[in-house]
Amino acid sequence: MIGKAFIILSLLNELPTPTAAQAAQGGALGKDVWLPLAKFTATAAKIPGRAAKLLQDRSAQIVNLMKLQVQADICLNKAASEVSALGWQALAVAIAADIGSLQSLQQQRSEEAIAAAAAAEFARGHAAEFFKVAAAVQSAANSGCLTTNNKGGAAGSVINGFSTLGTAEQPAIGATSTAHVGDDITAITTTGFSDLAATDGIRTDSLTADTNCVLFKGGSDGPLTTANFGQSIPFAGGYLTRNPTANTASSADGTDFVSNPEDSKIAGIKVYRDAHAAAAKIRTAATFGSTFTDFKKLDQAKKSVHLRAAVKNIILGKPDGSVDDLSGEIDTKINQVFGEDQETFHSRFWDQLTKVKVEKAASGQEETTLDAITSFAALSRARTYYSTKVIKGLRDKISSLEIKNSKTEVKVTDADCNKHQSKDKCAAPCKWNENTTDINKKCSLDPVKATEQQAAQTAGAGEGAAGTTTDKCKDKKKDDCKSPDCKWEGETCKDSSILLNKQFALMVSAAFVALLF
């Protein structure tokens, strides 16, 4: 029995056994080799649309901020209290500064977006050309250069197009699209493209069993039928390079261009490296600088460097101080003026847009509330209308004060001086002359002193212009400090004309501030 069994086993060993399919010269490129490149094309095709969306977002934010600034300016002109006016002024200044920051970088951001789109399309063009050529040489199910089978697999499943493949497998080989892409492109990492995984390029082991494909052969029966070609062929921008030696690898890795820029795996795919360098600048909205401050949200407004600076300069009145050094005071003042929660903030400020009435004369539209006006032109017209109205009111007050001031000025005449019959009462601008023959005119007007005093009164300058007392009034008691020459203020008797000039100066200053905003 043992002898018979031995004979049977020996015979079985002699029988032919089926062999697995093997990669061969003339095989089609396996799907697991070309699929990373196909995924990259889909990623790259999104970049122009993402760039366009990010630029549109920046432009829309600038327009939105411009409207908010105009609304804040109108509310400032119509503010019912000083605290409210200061708050609106700080908001308007902060929003204007934010607009300035965005606009100053707009050209740079536009150039970065264009560069990203151009570089991505250039790289995608290399890949798209590869897919078009490789698929075009198919002639039958078992004859062609691309297959949906993996490397080392059986011949067959050769393709001449990609429409029948799943969405995740289809290479993007069509025209450039700028259709907006709203989300960040996660396949663009900080170091490279996650799609472009490490590869050995095209070699015999990358192929399937023979499908009559000459394009990827590495020997003398390849593209050059008389001899091996002289150097590597950089298919698809070098990512799928074919070495002239049949099974020699041509390594490439597009997932990391940063850690080792001189790595040999990067040397042959510089077109993808350049594409990543440009695309990385629009990798996320934050990277591109398209994360914006929403000044209607208290938590964001409080963090705005522009609002904090405005609060420091305008509300605290400390323009020379540092925002960092005054951080505690700024936080306290923000809470006092704007509120400590979103509801209070909106109640004090942005909800007022629904209550502020804008008449037709201001906007050119039928009377409505400020929040209902969407036209920037109408908003700008209303701001000009109310600003002009405020400035006119200030000018009217200044004119009134000038008239009052001129009427109140005391002009001493020679006859006034003649009334003083003793030297101790003959004070400036009068002058005592002991040698005059006319005893009724020993005290007479000194023209020089009279001119000096009149000039001081007119300009609000001279002794007492800053609110100090003058010789005429300084020694008088409260009961003797009477108009038109003097006026009691605080604990001293002061020149009334100087007080009027001081008030006039304050009004001029107020008008100047109004013109600035």
From Swiss-Prot:
Where is the sequence biased in composition, kind Low complexity?
A: 454-470
Q: Which InterPro entries match?
A: Trypano_VSG_A_N_dom, Variant_surf_glycoprt_trypan_C, VSG_C_dom_sf
Specify whether Transport is a keyword of the entry. no
Q: Where in the cell is it found?
A: Cell membrane
Q: Could you tell me the membrane topology recorded for this protein?
A: Lipid-anchor; GPI-anchor
**Signal peptide stretch:** 1-21
Prosequence residues removed at maturation? 496-517
Any Gene Ontology CC annotation: plasma membrane
**Record-linked Pfam families:** Trypan_glycop (PF00913), Trypan_glycop_C (PF10659)
List S-S links within the chain: C417-C430, C426-C443
Task: Spell out the Basic and acidic residues composition-biased ranges.
Answer: 471-487
Q: What is its main location?
A: membrane
Provide the lipid-modification sites (GPI-anchor amidated aspartate).
D495
Q: Name one GO biological process term.
A: symbiont-mediated evasion of host immune response
Q: What does this protein do?
A: VSG forms a coat on the surface of the parasite. The trypanosome evades the immune response of the host by expressing a series of antigenically distinct VSGs from an estimated 1000 VSG genes.
**Protein name according to UniProt:** Variant surface glycoprotein MVAT5
The root-end lineage is: Eukaryota, Discoba, Euglenozoa, Kinetoplastea, Metakinetoplastina
